Each structure stands twice: as structure tokens, then as C-alpha cells.
Amino acid sequence: RILDAGSILNYSFLLDHHKLQNKNLFISTLAPEQDAFWNKGISYIYEDLRNTCFRNDYFDWITSLSTVEHIGLDNTMLYTSDEAKRESDGEGYLAAIKEFHRILKPGGKLFLSVPFGEHKVRGWFQIFNGEMVDSIKTTFSPTEIKENYFQYQGSGWVNSSRELASNATYFDIHTEKDYGNDYAAA
């Protein structure tokens, strides 16, 4: 079983990939989206990732890409009209990490991505710094963790290190008019 926590896989060209064929895929997102692929056997759950409906040790894999940086913050800008989701809890993501740990089978894999660099709350998302990544690791322990860091440069995304990426900044494509020098948007 695979949980797509945040609906990053909800595109036909991804769902048709041979690696996802014959998999029991659940897509969990805050609110219904324009496209749904029930005909492909996808199960959709509309819920807050801080309090899921799944039993303990249910998933073999969880993917949560470009999602947890929005948890606990103002999700009314892009994702829902539910005023209850106009929040400002900068640590709300930790409840989702606890939930991922609870519903992931022992030995299961979590694929998680967050924007990393200089911490900044943008209202509807936040940039994670080293302390916040460490809090994720502590919350998800005990388990084996492998970290990878990437940085955007003029030529595109490149492998980096925690130290080198710690000063990265991001352009907010939805609220700012001028791109940063590196064109890295979040």
C-alpha cells in the first residue's frame, strides 16, 4: 500500500507509470481537486494529515512531497475555502510527521521533501531550516533516516549539502512580482 500524502501523484501520466501499476494507492489531500482517477483504482481521502483515518502500521510507502510546509498554515489561499484552515501554527507539520510514523509499517519508507534554507513563514507555506529538519527526524525516530539536499542554480537543481543550502531563499510565485537572482520559486 502506498499513501500519497498531499496529492503529488494525482496526474494521469504519473499514475500510468509502470512502477505504480498494480499498487494499492491512496491519495490523501485536504480538499477535492479538479481531477480524480477512480477508474484507475485510486482511493481518495479528503482529510487533514495531522489526523488521518488509517489504522496503525497500514502503509508500506508514504510519499509527501511539497506538502508538510503548508500544514498548520493558511491553506485558504490555494487549497480550500474552509476558513477553519486559515491557520498560523508553524509547528503543525510535526503532528503530520507523528501521524506518518504511526501509519507507516515497521521497515516502511517515507519520502518527504520540504523547501530548505533560511526559515521564513510566507503565510501559506514556510521554508524549513536545520532545526526544523532535526525536529522531523526526532519526531520520526527511532528509524533509519537518509537526507539529501538540493539547491537551485541557474542551470537547474543540483545536489548540495545541508551547510551549503542553509542560506537558500525562495521566491513566492503567488505573492511576489520579482524573481530572485536564482529563479528558485516555491
Please state what every model-predicted region is.
Residues 130-186:
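A C-terminal cap/extension of S-adenosyl-L-methionine-dependent methyltransferases
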Residues 87, 91, 112, 117-138:
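Acceptor-substrate binding/catalytic loop of class I
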Residues 65-68, 84, 113:
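Residues lining the SAM
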Residues 3-52:
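Class I SAM-dependent methyltransferase SAM/SAH-binding core
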Residues 50-62:
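A short acidic, Gly/Pro-enriched loop at the edge of an enzyme's catalytic core
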Residues 63, 72:
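A conserved beta-strand element that flanks and buttresses the S-adenosyl-L-methionine
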Residues 73-78:
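Conserved catalytic-core motifs of eukaryotic protein kinase domains, centered on the activation segment
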Residues 80-109:
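A short glycine-rich, Lys/Arg-flanked "PGG" loop and its adjoining helix->strand segment in the class I
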